[in-house]
């Protein structure tokens, strides 16, 4: 059986609103931290979302 290569992560808003998205990524192919521009509905703007650990 194959190992589960994908790990669940949390993308947290850099605007400090507390809003976050959850997603998964392959740790083997992308070991660096993920940073994406996504929509923050709290402030109604696109902001940078940075990867944090999902607890």
Curated annotation (Swiss-Prot):
Bias-annotated ranges (Polar residues): 14-24
Keyword Ribosomal protein among UniProt keywords: yes
One GO-annotated biological process of the protein: translation
The protein's name: Large ribosomal subunit protein bL33
HAMAP family: Ribosomal_bL33 (MF_00294)
Protein family: Belongs to the bacterial ribosomal protein bL33 family.
Any one Gene Ontology cellular component term annotated for this protein: cytosolic large ribosomal subunit
Keyword Ribosomal protein: yes
Keywords: Ribonucleoprotein, Ribosomal protein
InterPro entries associated with the record: Ribosomal_bL33, Ribosomal_bL33_CS, Ribosomal_bL33_sf, Ribosomal_zn-bd
Compositional bias annotation for Basic and acidic residues: 1-11
Region feature Disordered, mapped onto this chain: 1-29
One GO molecular-function entry: structural constituent of ribosome
Species in which this protein is naturally found: Polynucleobacter asymbioticus (strain DSM 18221 / CIP 109841 / QLW-P1DMWA-1)
């Amino acid at each position: 059986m194959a190992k589960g290569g994908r790990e669940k992560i949390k993308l947290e808003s850099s605007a400090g609103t507390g809003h976050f998205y959850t997603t998964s990524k392959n740790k083997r192919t992308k070991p660096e931290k993920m940073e994406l521009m996504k929509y923050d509905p709290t402030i109604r703007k696109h902001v940078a979302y940075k990867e944090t650990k999902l607890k």
